[in-house]
Amino acid sequence: MAKSSSLNVRVVEGRALPAKDVSGSSDPYCLVKVDDEVVARTATVWRSLGPFWGEEYTVHLPLDFHQLAFYVLDEDTVGHDDIIGKISLSREAITADPRGIDSWINLSRVDPDAEVQGEICLSVQMLEDGQGRCLRCHVLQARDLAPRDISGTSDPFARVFWGSQSLETSTIKKTRFPHWDEVLELREMPGAPSPLRVELWDWDMVGKNDFLGMVEFSPKTLQQKPPKGWFRLLPFPRAEEDSGGNLGALRVKVRLIEDRVLPSQCYQPLMELLMESVQGPAEEDTASPLALLEELTLGDCRQDLATKLVKLFLGRGLAGRFLDYLTRREVARTMDPNTLFRSNSLASKSMEQFMKLVGMPYLHEVLKPVISRVFEEKKYMELDPCKMDLGRTRRISFKGALSEEQMRETSLGLLTGYLGPIVDAIVGSVGRCPPAMRLAFKQLHRRVEERFPQAEHQDVKYLAISGFLFLRFFAPAILTPKLFDLRDQHADPQTSRSLLLLAKAVQSIGNLGQQLGQGKELWMAPLHPFLLQCVSRVRDFLDRLVDVDGDEAGVPARALFPPSAIVREGYLLKRKEEPAGLATRFAFKKRYVWLSGETLSFSKSPEWQMCHSIPVSHIRAVERVDEGAFQLPHVMQVVTQDGTGALHTTYLQCKNVNELNQWLSALRKASAPNPNKLAACHPGAFRSARWTCCLQAERSAAGCSRTHSAVTLGDWSDPLDPDAEAQTVYRQLLLGRDQLRLKLLEDSNMDTTLEADTGACPEVLARQRAATARLLEVLADLDRAHEEFQQQERGKAALGPLGP
């Protein structure tokens, strides 16, 4: 039985932060760390003591993580950033409420002695001889210690305490991965049994030594099960210092989702029930398991369920049938065509998530060039007279302020200058739209046309498609490019306003111009002639989009997009593993990098032919590199294995921590199915005849730090996992099991007289009872399977580890 763990984290906003700049303000941003590893960084909000971020992350994690921390810092253009405060949430605190955490939490002061990380490897023995008892502590090594020196390393030594006695190991200079391999022996002194405490310290020539962490073992543990193995370092026990709100507060939302995923055969009955649902008629179907699942799902859970169901049916090659089933149900119960797909129904959410899962490479290809132009050119555009800054031109030139009419004309020209290429890219993208999306739109077009064939409703079939493609896909991506991975950072206020105007225009085009002049925003009127010109082109585009032959048989199952599709691309600095004769700063060369499901490729620019590529199947590890390795930040390594079994390392430097995390995540996901992954690697580099991390002199020395292949950011490129998706559906059904039982009881007690009075069909009621009973039976079987596997786990845990 596999286990999965993921954190949904939303950094909402801060309030009452202290001023760190001479201007009386701060430039705050937030770092999100899991077990001392940075997994995300928010955008910087300039000149604010009450910043709003609204950034959301899904982090897939190993099951043994311990702590989630938020650090709020003030960005400085010169020197180091100032730390404002932090919030620490233990795993236990997060899981205390199944709904997670959603609250304001006061920031606390960052205590250097509490900022510990890493592990120590020990072997302890209790010996007895003629002179009494003796404790032998074999201090082997430590890994991933906190950097305490300006060089990004430490000078660690261990100090062992037992009773009133203490001994120290030697000090190993300039490493976070020390190897001592020293045995310390302490004689038991008269008195009560004493605990064993091992402390790690960073030796400093000037000033006091810095604390690196400690472990402690009770006398009972020493006697019954002497410690042997790796142990997580902890800070000194102390009460959490409450700042009383003096450092401000942070509003966060955190939810931990942990699941035990059973073997595939356990979910087969549930899968068969769901697959059967999409095979039959849907217009009046209230009896299928899928219809019951939709009925049981509340609005706040609908999006997550829609995502899992779409992935589930994609994995079986039946996503089109699933969407068609929901579409038929939605269309059949819609009386007014103006309200079609306007609610957040399961059908609407499923189509929306389907587009995000299947169409993100397509979206990037269509919109990214123009979105990049908007960010880079930073043109001022405004049509609303109430928001126009007429004095802006006076501040940046000597020509004086523009009149309102001049500002409107200038802004209109700029807007149409961006909208034109956007519309051109969209209407010219028929051949690039994924076949699965085109087939889904074709089905949608046909179902709506069959339901509303009247002449006065001839636009409804177009509006149904454009409502998804334009209003729920293109327009939101233009409005918030970062959420669709089109940009690494949120837009500044001026660019954000420009994007809002463009998104409004694209929405109006998606509505086929039907609402132009009817809303409150009459200041958009100067743009209406251009928008109306685009409407006829969009109609023609939609006709060509749904003019596609074939069915789902031609769409590969268990894949969101072809293996050759580009998952991530951009400029990085690249360095080969081989020693370079040049200085380090010249060894990294600027390269354009593409990542697909098949290869990691490099060239000098996007227009050049690829000059080098690495098969993704050869990747064995993707990890961060310590800053001290090359005296450079944001470096990662890609470790590959050739046909002879030899390992090779490619180093890549990113612009910032967010770009680093995104590339790490993308590479780890792409290489997730690879066999023979490395359990450990070197976070340093082999330079000057030794590893910079652990100081070992052999290039072939075993890695000194654990790899983190399970730590990834959740996004549209997540691989399909049908068993995990089925587990989520099972969990959702569990929440509604009482309702299912009540429904079965009501249907069983309903007599034929009541059936006649209510107009209910006996055959429909019989199918409802059968479907409800089958669902409850499947849930009971899955309950038993989970209990059996948990009993097996408890049995294995009781036996204890078989080795060190």
Swiss-Prot record:
Domain C2, which positions?
1-105, 116-231
Which sites bind Ca(2+) 3? D149, D155, D202, D204
Single Gene Ontology BP annotation: cell differentiation
Residues the entry annotates as binding Ca(2+) 1:
D21, D27, D74, D76
Q: Does Nucleus count among this protein's keywords?
A: no
Q: What is the purpose of this protein?
A: Probable inhibitory regulator of the Ras-cyclic AMP pathway. Plays a role in dendrite formation by melanocytes.
Question: Protein name, please?
Answer: RasGAP-activating-like protein 1
